[in-house]
Every structure is written in C-alpha cells, then in structure tokens.
C-alpha cells in the first residue's frame, strides 16, 4: 500500500531531478549500446546533495520496512558510489564499493568494505536500461556468498532491466521511472 509519506518522498525526488535538468535530448549511445533520443545525465543528480539526500530518504523509507539483519549497501564504481554512500549514511548500514575490475596492487580487491558470507546486500544504481551493468555487480557479490535480492535505481528507463534482473532472482525497485519524469518509454 502506498502511503502519503512515500508519495511525498517520491514527488520531492522527481521535482529535484527535474530541477537539475538531468534529461537531455538528442542522439545518444547508452552504456547498453542502445541508441536513444534522450539521455539521463544522472551525474547532474548524483553530484547534487539535495538529490542524494532525497534519494537516500526514499530508500531508507523502503528499507526500514524490511528485515535489516546483516544488511550492507553497495554501489558500483563510479556512478553509484555517491548514491550508495548517501544511503549508507541515511540507513546507518555499512557501505560496499564494487570495482569494475580488481585493483592491480595492494589487496587486489574487487569489493571494498566488509562483506561476509550470508550478508544481505542492497545494490544501488544510478540509471538502468537493460540492467547489464548492475547484473555484473550482483554476480560479484554472490561469488563471495553475499545475498542480493534487491536493487534500487534512481531512474529506470523501463527498457527491460526489471525483467532481465528478475531472471536472476533480483527485484529492481525504481525510485523514479522515466514515465514519472514525463517521458514515454
């Protein structure tokens, strides 16, 4: 059931995303390789403290209603680290940073932060199209016996990510959809 608090938090995030003009129009190639007539320049949002705070509050609203035992918040470098950090601060849950490739020096870690077998992990993502990028992070976490059941994304372009991730037993929870930003899929 949707509450007035959820609606209020979501509407504030939508307003802030529009305020930072994060949707651009033109001809773009997305990370998925798809061509698009619009681009969600999410870095305009994820470098804005008001947007980060609003997104973190909305995720905390959702997370506070669930079992939070051994919960960690993960973000994939570079795009999702600021989001995951904001959510970690808001929820007071430990932060994990998932590298795209392992360090070639020191510990040579691919996952930074303390991840123990059996820990529950929520992965944060900035934008999803097909879900391919974030799916790799899920695989990395699961490879070391972490449990990933949910991914929270600031903006879902509604182009298959939800369905693709569901095939990997992961629920994609968009904080905002592209439709809610006023664009058709």
Swiss-Prot record:
Example of a GO biological process term: 'de novo' UMP biosynthetic process
Cofactor entry: Mg(2+)
Binding site for orotate: 129, 157
Keyword DNA-binding (UniProt): no
Binding sites annotated in the UniProt record for 5-phospho-alpha-D-ribose 1-diphosphate: 99-100, 103, 125-133
UniProt xrefs under Pfam families: Pribosyltran
Catalytic activity: orotidine 5'-phosphate + diphosphate = orotate + 5-phospho-alpha-D-ribose 1-diphosphate
Pathway linked to the protein: Pyrimidine metabolism; UMP biosynthesis via de novo pathway; UMP from orotate: step 1/2
InterPro entries in the record: OPRT (IPR023031), Or_phspho_trans_dom (IPR004467), PRibTrfase_dom (IPR000836), PRTase-like (IPR029057)
GO MF entry, a single one: magnesium ion binding
Class of enzymatic activity (EC top level): transferase
E.C. number: 2.4.2.10
Keywords: Glycosyltransferase, Magnesium, Pyrimidine biosynthesis, Transferase
Family under the similarity heading: Belongs to the purine/pyrimidine phosphoribosyltransferase family. PyrE subfamily.
Subunit structure: Homodimer.
Reported function: Catalyzes the transfer of a ribosyl phosphate group from 5-phosphoribose 1-diphosphate to orotate, leading to the formation of orotidine monophosphate (OMP).
Name used for this protein in its record: Orotate phosphoribosyltransferase
Organism: Methanococcus maripaludis (strain DSM 14266 / JCM 13030 / NBRC 101832 / S2 / LL)
This protein's encoding gene: pyrE
